[in-house]
Amino acid sequence: MAKERGRRNLKKIKESSQSDSLKTLKADPSPSREAAQIDVNTFFGLVNSEELDYFKQAESTLNANAFENSEERQGFVSSVFEEAKGKELKLVTNQICSKLMERLILNGSDRQVKRLFKAFNGHFLSLAVHKYSSHVLETLFIRSASVIENELLNNYQEEEAEEEESDEVFATMENMFLFMLAELSSSIQKLIVHQYGSHVIRLLLLIVGARELPSSIMSNSILRSKKSKIARKMIEIKDNQDSNRAYQVPAGFKNELQELLGLIAKDKDSKQLRELAIDKIASPVIQLCIQLEGLVDKDRTIWTTIFPEVDDKDPKEEAFVEYLLSDPIGSHFFQAAIKYQKPKTVHRLYDLYIKDRLLKLAKRETTGAFVVKELLGKLKATDVTEMLDILIPHLSELIENNLEIGQAIVDASIARNNYGKEGIISQFLKVFNDANVLESVLKLSTSTLGNTKNDWPTAEERRCAIFLEKLVEYDDSFLDAVIAALLELPEDRFIQMCMHGVFSHVVESVLVIERVDIVKRRRLLNIFTEHVVTLSCNAYGSHIMDKLWQFSIKLNLFKDRIALALFENKDKIKDSIYGKLVWKNWSMELYCRRMYDWKNLIKQQELELFPDHRGAPTLLKKRPLEEPKKVEEKKDKSRGRRRYH
């Protein structure tokens, strides 16, 4: 009998073992998918044609929001609530009427929310697994969290007259909420793998965990599915002030959180929880459980069941980690899960399964690269510098199709006193040296720049712009490259960039007086001064005009030309809400009425920025017969700006 080979044969056996484990993961159907078929009644009757016409018109009226005041709107909402009384269940399960119910919840009073909550008692499970009513429940639960906080703070905003006229007696919102939790808890293991019910469970976990409740329309929201977020934008259902914030909840909600997490993990071993972690429906729920369990469980039962704390490699765990690093759903789970773990815990997984093939994983741009990016911000300094030593020499390859990994490497370098900066710069310059950096990074030729259809900037454009801004901030060589590329653009294209919702931020990022030499400042200002009015009256260009107040220091000829253009077109400037802010931030009222004071303001600005400059001009003196007036220091009038709309 032939002698078996040594290490090579062992390697084959090991690979075969891992392959079998991976096949098992891939071959298994979604966990408990058949069990997730919840047998409940979701039919509560049909809305007749007359009712449908009335409620459809009411939905349109609320959407138009053409009420003269809030009292008129509240009166209309109350009348629709009254008309819907006794019909709530069939309305929330109707496609058109469910949108109306969401609007009523968003505009209703605390008492009206309680009345609706009471109408759903005993039917929450049925509503949670229905395509339309599940969305209504999510909106209702967010409003309920607001009411619970009001009750805790004794901050009731109900009209006393309404309570006196009504004979209805309601329990506290807290008790009603707990009663609903009890109804859903019995089916929670089926709900977490249900197409609609899983979203409801995610929201409930956030509420009882006192975490921020996300927007239902933002692209990165964990509250709704992608289709739901797009649909809500199309039908113009906007969140009220209750979203995008956390609420105070009773202390007893911690016990509810602990109970919910316990029910989700009940009777589940590593294999079953791992199946849930890679299931496209259940995975976001398990991510959230891992995020929250540290609040009530020091042992972090769900995490340690999925990733047992052992010192050596485990073939099954190794196969599972490999699947996570090669699967889009799995990599998203892995990235989100390690974000909330201690560096020591994450180090074990990195050291056992990732370190030896870090570069290979970083090249998996749709899977493993996201985990590598998270590790760069999570691990200890020694691990991160080790990662940088491996990744930096190959940075030019990595960013060809994945700019985000480049940004993560730059962030990691900055966080560690610019570790490996020279290598990073040389790698980036390999890519951008022989090409226009704006085209290489922003892909201007295929972007929404210059579109006349009011296209929103794409998510890809936002990512590319943020990456380029990061490079400009990182080193002057990138700043110079971007300025050179801007100056090479046709003038109309340059101005289009200044008025673009995303690319205008890139232009703003180079307008830093301390880093740009005077020759380049003159060349840029030459272009800006020809388009003062256009930029001032634009939502994005007006921010660039604000920055030019400081960018034109010691180039007073350009500052005067800009001020003169504003003055000569003051009617048009003042008619624009954006132009008014530019007018204010350039102190144009002072320019019109007290030119000496305006000139002195400029001199003070120069002295503040260059206090040690020899031969700095002195403040202009007033006319002899006028009473001297002290020039007040210019206050910072910079206005807030959202980061990409």
Swiss-Prot record:
Residues 623-636 have a biased composition (Basic and acidic residues). Residues 1-33, 619-645 are annotated as: Disordered. This is Nucleolar protein 9. GO terms for cellular component: 90S preribosome; nucleolus; preribosome, small subunit precursor; small-subunit processome. Pumilio repeats lie at residues 83-118, 119-154, 183-219, 259-304, 316-351, 353-389, 489-526, 527-564. GO terms for molecular function: mRNA binding. Belongs to the NOP9 family. GO terms for biological process: endonucleolytic cleavage in 5'-ETS of tricistronic rRNA transcript (SSU-rRNA, 5.8S rRNA, LSU-rRNA); endonucleolytic cleavage in ITS1 to separate SSU-rRNA from 5.8S rRNA and LSU-rRNA from tricistronic rRNA transcript (SSU-rRNA, 5.8S rRNA, LSU-rRNA); endonucleolytic cleavage to generate mature 5'-end of SSU-rRNA from (SSU-rRNA, 5.8S rRNA, LSU-rRNA); negative regulation of gene expression; post-transcriptional regulation of gene expression; regulation of biological quality; ribosomal small subunit export from nucleus. The gene is NOP9. Residues 1-11 have a biased composition (Basic residues). InterPro entries: ARM-like (IPR011989), ARM-type_fold (IPR016024), NOP9 (IPR040000), PUM-HD (IPR033133), Pumilio_RNA-bd_rpt (IPR001313). The lineage of its organism: Eukaryota, Fungi, Dikarya, Ascomycota, Saccharomycotina. SMART domains: Pumilio (SM00025). The keyword Repeat applies. It comes from Komagataella phaffii (strain GS115 / ATCC 20864) (Yeast).
